[in-house]
Amino acid sequence: MNAHIPPHIHPPKVELFDLDAMTNTDSKGIVREVREYRVEPFGLYVARDVIDHRRIHALESWLLPELGLRVTDWFYRPGHEREEHHYIDVVRIDIDASGRCWRTQDHYLDLVVCTGRSVDVLDTDELLDAVLAGLLDSATAQAALATTYRTLDGLARHGYRLERWLPTVGASPTWSRR
């Protein structure tokens, strides 16, 4: 590992999802209560409140292991709404033998989807800096880029509509407000 890691660079963020305890341990080690977990053949649905955040009051996410994605719909507080419709993290997802504990490792790249209009890729600089700092190996970085390109291509081919693309790759997530 490089001894001169820029201050904005961090190791890959890890989250835990414990279905039996109904908790989500975030990347800072804070344990959050989960309102709902739902396991489907293609992934895990997570719904929880976001406490003590001035802009966001809740979230729904789908962990999609075969796609290497976490797709999130944020619920913004009044006056803090954003144009984005889905936030996609490129992740590695591990599931324990019981299927009751899921783990994500964030691979820095994020995609912001404005349904029917566009998708933006964020944090490419963080990915590259993490590789240079020895926090992520090149094979993992290449896999993250391939996942990002595949996701961009799928979204573009389906009019930037997540709900049209995901079923073509075996995932049919449902959302509480869509």
Question: Predicted segments — roles?
Answer:
Residues T147-R178:
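Cysteine/selenocysteine-centered motifs that mediate thiol-based redox chemistry or coordinate metal-sulfur cofactors
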Residues A47-A97, W102:
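The feature represents the first ordered module of a protein
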Residues R32-Y37, L69-V71, V119:
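Generic structural motif
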Residues M1-L59:
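Charge-rich, low-complexity N-terminal segments
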Residues E36-V39, L63, V112-V113:
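Well-ordered beta-strand positions
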Residues M1-P12, V113, V119-D120, E126-Y149:
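Compact, glycine/acidic-enriched structural inserts
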Residues E83-G134:
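Conserved, surface-exposed functional patches that form binding/active-site neighborhoods
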Residues H80-E84, T124-L127, L145-R150, A156-Y160:
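Low-complexity, flexible helical/coil segments
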